[in-house]
């Protein structure tokens, strides 16, 4: 087949193999992605500022409008932007306290509270949008990577050692640009659990306020996260896979080695790029907040300013919010994706060989 790459399969077959891997990976890993996004998108609790020794808190009625002060009752105040506030005329003497169930203290706490208060299906919220985005993005990305790597190595434009790094970075940069609007919508669905109708209204408002450019809100930190991630991932993957393949018989499939190599390289890349993932999530979730407070989306803080702000407000720990779910997700998702992709390529290689022999 003239249109086959050096691995013996066509670009279309590469896209089918990678798209299948994307579906399998999304079904298994979406719950961890939902938890990661929810952990990253929540603001630092005001409770820690008002009552450091307890997460149960209230505000003085003197700060409320007179119409609310006159009620003399405990009430829950929600303005749609900040966290819910429990307001009590008796202050600390009141026996009834409000504890915000949407505040998460960790990964397991997030899993338990999401299931308890929102239902198990919430763990797969945004899955349709995830599949709509992930399948074409992964098909484009993996196919572009293999084609670029073959191109770079075939024309000796770079050494075989660094070809995976360059090819991975270029492939991811193009994919991020094409898929960025869908990534924004998926993050919005997972972080605030809005309906598709509400999401559409939110997007229309953002476009009306800031133009079509607002749909690429978060492109900068997404690129800063994904391009280095891709470069690090493929560089380490090819190295680890090459090393592991030295321990297997020549007639043994390399899918198992790909699984291990993918998990290791994905973990390393995820740790090093996590701060940019936090910034990307907060910037994209801010789309709804901009609508609520009527902020012009064109005037957004730079990635570096957001990094400094997060560190000032939450410390270095804030830059690694969602660390555990991201790492827990990165290792198996990268392992599942690359091993499924390699299995698909092996399947098509055998299929093409059988066709040649049969023809």
UniProtKB/Swiss-Prot annotation:
It is a multi-pass membrane protein. It catalyses: glutathione(in) = glutathione(out). Solcar repeats lie at residues 9-151, 159-243, 253-347. It comes from Homo sapiens. It comes from the Eukaryota. Belongs to the mitochondrial carrier (TC 2.A.29) family. [2Fe-2S] cluster binds at residues 74, 78, 88, 94. Residues 36-121, 182-214, 280-317 are mitochondrial matrix. Keywords: 2Fe-2S, Heme biosynthesis, Iron, Iron-sulfur, Membrane, Metal-binding, Mitochondrion, Mitochondrion inner membrane, Repeat, Transmembrane, Transmembrane helix, Transport. This is Mitochondrial glutathione transporter SLC25A39. The activity of SLC25A39 is regulated by levels of mitochondrial glutathione via its ability to bind [2Fe-2S] iron-sulfur cluster. Upon physiological levels of mitochondrial glutathione, glutathione prevents iron-sulfur-binding to SLC25A39 promoting cleavage and degradation by AFG3L2. Upon depletion of mitochondrial glutathione, SLC25A39 binds iron-sulfur, preventing cleavage and degradation by AFG3L2. Cleaved and degraded by AFG3L2; degradation by AFG3L2 is regulated by the ability of SLC25A39 to bind iron-sulfur. In absence of mitochondrial glutathione, SLC25A39 binds iron-sulfur, preventing cleavage and degradation by AFG3L2. The presence of mitochondrial glutathione prevents iron-sulfur-binding to SLC25A39, promoting cleavage and degradation by AFG3L2. The chain crosses the membrane at residues 15-35, 122-142, 161-181, 215-235, 259-279, 318-338. GO terms for molecular function: 2 iron, 2 sulfur cluster binding; glutathione transmembrane transporter activity; metal ion binding.
């Amino acid at each position: 087949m003239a249109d086959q790459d050096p691995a013996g399969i066509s670009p279309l077959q590469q896209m089918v193999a990678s798209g299948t891997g994307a579906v399998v990976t999304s079904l298994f890993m979406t719950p961890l992605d939902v938890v990661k996004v929810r952990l990253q998108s929540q603001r630092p609790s005001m409770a820690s500022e008002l009552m450091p020794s307890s997460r149960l808190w209230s505000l003085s009625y003197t700060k409320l409008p007179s119409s609310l002060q006159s009620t003399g009752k405990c009430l829950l105040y929600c303005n749609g932007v900040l966290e819910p506030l429990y307001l009590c005329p008796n202050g600390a003497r009141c026996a009834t306290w409000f504890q915000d169930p949407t505040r998460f203290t960790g990964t397991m706490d997030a899993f338990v509270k999401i299931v308890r208060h929102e239902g198990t299906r919430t763990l797969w919220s945004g899955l349709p949008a995830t599949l709509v985005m992930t399948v074409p993005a992964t098909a484009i990305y993996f196919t572009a990577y293999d084609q670029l790597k073959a191109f770079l190595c075939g024309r000796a434009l770079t050494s075989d050692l660094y070809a995976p790094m360059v090819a991975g970075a270029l492939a991811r940069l193009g994919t991020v640009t094409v898929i960025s609007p869908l990534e924004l919508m998926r993050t919005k669905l997972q972080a605030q659990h809005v309906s598709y109708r509400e999401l559409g209204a939110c997007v229309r408002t953002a476009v009306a306020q800031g133009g079509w450019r607002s749909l690429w809100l978060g492109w900068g930190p997404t690129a800063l996260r994904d391009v280095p991630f891709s470069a690090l991932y493929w560089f380490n993957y090819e190295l680890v896979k090459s090393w592991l393949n030295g321990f297997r018989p020549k007639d043994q499939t390399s899918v198992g080695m790909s699984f291990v190599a993918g998990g290791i390289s994905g973990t390393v890349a995820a740790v090093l790029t996590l701060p940019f993932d936090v910034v990307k999530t907060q910037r994209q979730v801010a789309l709804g907040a901009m609508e609520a407070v009527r902020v012009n989306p064109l005037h957004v803080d730079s990635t570096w300013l957001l990094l400094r702000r997060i560190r000032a407000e939450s410390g270095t720990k804030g830059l690694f919010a969602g660390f555990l779910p991201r790492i827990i997700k990165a290792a198996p998702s990268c392992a599942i994706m690359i091993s499924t992709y390699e299995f698909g390529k092996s399947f098509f290689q055998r299929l093409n060989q059988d066709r040649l022999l049969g023809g």
